């Protein structure tokens, strides 16, 4: 499931001003639009993905049937502050409940060291803002959000 390549979880690369601006746009976009952007990325990679919909924060936002037939779930977090271990713990419980073979938490922010540590050894992939932007650039071929309007 590691479709958004990253050089580890410990050291984050510096963020340039254009990336900071793009991350702010991701944070400000409507939740459904952000989730759909994630769905579109997985679909571009040949997987089948759909939003779960509904109001309020859930343990997961997207269900994926991988090209291999595996069942994955994804949680999206449009946060400015770091994502902590409680989010990872709740997400892992959802993975077990849903019988998901893989899971990903995608955020516009960062992950705390404890969150990253908790995800280690589990089938949970963590993608922070810079890693998600890199995926957008690599998979979609553009920053996607590098114009003044994103809607």
Model segments located where?
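Mixed-charge (Asp/Glu-Lys/Arg
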Residues: 1-58, 63-151
